[in-house]
């Protein structure tokens, strides 16, 4: 299945990013299947940008909550965020970390985790890996109810997942989870990374290339801009929302960090960087009115 292959490709790209020194992740190489994938400097920096932003969001949410949090990772694939958090701080305040994905990916991930003591030793009652179909909204809610506790601060993350599903489905999924699982009035955050802008020349090529690969951005036309993503979050009841292109997100990275990244690899064509990263957005939304966590 094409979606399973995209998960493995994403994993291999993170591995290359780690080997170049961008990220500290001692676990992701355990999941690598394709050792031939090599990123361009542009792709390495983009991978660093979104990976770091997601991790900083979760860390910031935990700090602001002041109590153990719950994490829901939609379409987690071979992501290692839970293991990175617990590796860096065994007492990281997470009550439950629930990863949801297709059955084949979940089975494979479970097998690899059990095979490596470095990962298996970090798995306890806090970590839950569940197979499910995100189209089955009620089924997802049922699974989450079995593992999560209403009233506990919860952060939902979706990295390049919802764009593969019709917008009406993902909106209903978020609404149902917020209403039936997390409980109204509970501190909730939603963080997403998705492709956007399908209608210009670059966007059309991006969409067509994916179709040739056997997959489809079924939700990209429903939320084609950062503003559309922000509007959805507002309509779902989030009070504080930040939705920006990845190009603009990078502009918030402190200069000293950018200098460090340049020492790892130089980007020669910033026009290409700007074009590509204008076609991806990062969304952070909170039900609270306090400022959002600082991403960088």
Outline where the language-model segments fall:
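Rossmann-like AdoMet/SAM-dependent catalytic core
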Residues: 201-296
């Amino acid at each position: 299945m094409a979606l399973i292959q995209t998960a493995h490709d994403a994993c291999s790209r993170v591995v290359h990013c780690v080997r170049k020194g961008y990220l500290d992740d001692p676990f992701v190489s355990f999941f690598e299947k394709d050792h031939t994938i090599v990123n361009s400097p542009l792709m390495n920096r983009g991978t660093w940008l979104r990976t770091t932003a997601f991790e900083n969001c979760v860390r910031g949410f935990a700090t602001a909550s002041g109590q153990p949090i719950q994490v829901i990772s939609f379409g987690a694939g071979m992501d290692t965020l839970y293991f990175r958090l617990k590796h860096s701080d065994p007492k990281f305040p997470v009550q439950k970390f629930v990863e949801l994905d297709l059955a084949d990916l979940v089975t494979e991930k479970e097998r690899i985790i059990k095979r490596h003591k470095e990962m298996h030793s970090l798995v306890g009652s806090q970590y839950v890996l569940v197979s499910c179909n995100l189209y089955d909204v009620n089924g997802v809610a049922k699974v989450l109810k079995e593992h999560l506790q209403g009233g506990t601060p919860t952060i939902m993350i979706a990295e390049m997942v919802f764009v593969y599903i019709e917008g009406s489905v993902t909106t209903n999924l978020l609404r149902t989870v917020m209403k039936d699982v997390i409980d109204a009035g509970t501190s909730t955050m939603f963080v997403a990374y998705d492709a956007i802008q399908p209608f210009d020349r670059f966007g059309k090529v991006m969409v067509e290339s994916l179709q040739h690969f056997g997959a489809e951005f079924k939700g990209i036309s429903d939320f084609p801009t950062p503003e559309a993503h922000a509007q959805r979050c507002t309509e779902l009841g989030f009070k504080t929302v930040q939705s920006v292109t990845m190009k603009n997100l990078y502009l918030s990275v402190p200069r000293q960090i950018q200098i460090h990244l340049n020492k790892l690899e130089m980007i020669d064509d910033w026009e290409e960087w700007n074009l590509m990263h204008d076609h991806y957005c990062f969304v952070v939304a909170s039900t609270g009115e306090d400022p959002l966590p600082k991403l960088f």
